């Protein structure tokens, strides 16, 4: 049975937190804390003010098994969060042991409420139960009326390192190991000092955050051939649900590589229930491009995590740049799933 809730219902918050905390399938962008920031940002984004939202909880015998946070735009239903930039992964929030039968029954009830509307599920990771369900049944007679399509959305890269640094380093290719040696020798030869700053929890250093967002915006402008980046900086720094989450969430992690006391590269994101950190932002300061700051940052971050006994893989999320694979990265995928209700 589907029951509709409002965002300010304490019962919804409690159900949401319980399902999310117990489920390692889900990414931090599905957490209640992150969704709160999205809701706050939505209030200042004109294009979202008139979008109708629906939050349904699917119950089986009075047991809540799945939350379906949705909004409607131009006669299409989307997962809430798709209308705000920032999230790398979206999903329904469900019991980790939810059965295929329950997912089907929830979709059947949703179809009764929104018959003739297209449901567009974007940024669904391959480990999601939703992806597994649709991949299993999308050509089955069970879902023939839904006209399900599954398309690749984005390639992501994750680094799962060994239990100690020597094992990790020797797991890399000979060419990658040689390149790492060369860049560290170059740093020493040119008297470039390096230091890794790690911020875990709410990011309270406003000056450092501004500095990081400045070169993040500059790098973005270089990539997009944009002449002016002032307004983009203001947006990223002060009017972004992602930045607000970085400033407020306990699960936040930022690794910032300093070269000669200046930020050379940083990656910022959130820990998950899956022994990993997902980084929606990974950026390098182009002023230090000759010193491979991305590789050095990843290398120093892995040393830090191993020294602190934190067995957390690094999901570098957006983009499949070559240096990520040189540092031991492997691909995983996000998908777009569409169906007719």
PLM segments and residue spans:
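Acyl-donor binding region in acyl/amide transferases
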Residues: 75-152, 274-331
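A conserved beta-strand-loop-helix scaffold within acyl/acetyltransferase catalytic domains
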Residues: 2-79, 124-133, 137, 145-156, ...
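Short beta-strand-to-coil "C-cap" segments at the C-terminal boundary of structured domains/repeats
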Residues: 159-161, 338-341
